[in-house]
C-alpha cells in the first residue's frame, strides 16, 4: 500500500508491531545483529499479512523505537522534530545526517522517549535509512500525517548532500 506524491514516495499504512525491540542488556542493539533482523522481519511480515506496508517497532518499555528497517521522526505543529532516543536500536548514519541537516536549518530536534499515545500529537512523520533515505509516512494506525514543507525540504537537502558526496 504505497502511494506517490509528486516524486516523493510515502508509506500509506503502518501498524504497531506486537514484537518489541529487546532490552539493551540482552543483545548488542547498537550493531547490525542477525537476531535483531529476525524481530524486524517477523514484524514486517505480520504487517503485510494485515494489509499494511510497514510496522512501527516499540522498545522493551513500550515506547516508539523505529520502523522495521529505518529510524523514525515526527514533526509537531511548531515545526520541531521528535525522534526516539537511540537506546535500543541502531543510531543510523542517515538519522544522524538528518539531525545535523535539521539543526543547520534551525529546526529543533528533540531526542526523547515517545509514547505510542503521543502519535496523534504530531502532524508529520518520516523514516530515515540507507534504503529509505527520507520517506514520508502517511499514517500509523488511525493517525494521519501530512507531507509538509519541513519534510520535503529535509528530503531535498539530504538528496543534494548525497549527490554531492557521490560526485566527489
Where are these regions (language model features)?
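Conserved beta-strand and immediately adjacent loop positions that scaffold enzyme active sites
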Residues: 1, 54, 71
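Single conserved hydrophobic/aromatic residue that forms the stacking wall/gate
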Residues: 1-6, 10-11
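Structural motif
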Residues: 1-2, 47, 64, 117
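Surface-exposed charge patches
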Residues: 2, 45, 96-100
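Structured loop/turn residues at beta-strand edges in well-structured enzyme cores
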Residues: 5, 50, 120
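Conserved catalytic-core subdomain
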Residues: 8, 64-168
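Short, conserved active-site entrance elements at the starts or edges of catalytic domains
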Residues: 15-65, 101, 108
Amino acid at each position: 500500500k504505497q502511494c506517490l506524491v509528486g516524486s516523493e514516495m510515502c508509506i500509506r499504512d503502518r501498524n504497531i508491531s506486537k514484537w518489541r525491540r529487546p532490552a539493551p542488556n540482552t543483545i548488542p542493539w547498537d550493531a547490525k545483529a542477525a537476531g535483531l533482523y529476525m524481530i524486524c522481519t517477523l514484524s514486517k511480515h505480520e504487517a503485510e499479512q494485515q494489509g499494511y506496508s510497514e510496522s512501527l517497532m516499540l522498545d522493551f518499555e513500550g515506547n516508539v523505537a523505529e520502523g522495521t528497517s529505518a529510524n523514525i521522526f515526527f514533526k509537531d505543529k511548531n515545526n520541531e522534530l521528535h525522534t526516539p532516543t537511540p537506546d535500543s536500536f541502531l543510531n543510523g548514519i542517515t538519522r544522524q545526517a538528518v539531525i545535523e541537516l535539521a539543526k543547520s536549518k534551525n529546526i529543533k530536534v528533540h531526542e526523547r522517549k515517545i509514547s505510542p499515545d503521543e502519535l496523534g500529537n504530531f502532524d508529520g512523520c518520516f523514516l530515515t535509512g540507507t534504503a529509505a533515505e527520507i520517506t514520508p509516512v502517511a499514517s500509523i494506525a488511525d493517525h494521519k500525517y501530512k507531507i509538509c514543507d519541513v519534510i520535503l525540504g529535509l528530503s531535498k537537502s539530504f538528496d543534494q548532500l548525497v549527490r554531492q558526496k557521490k560526485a566527489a
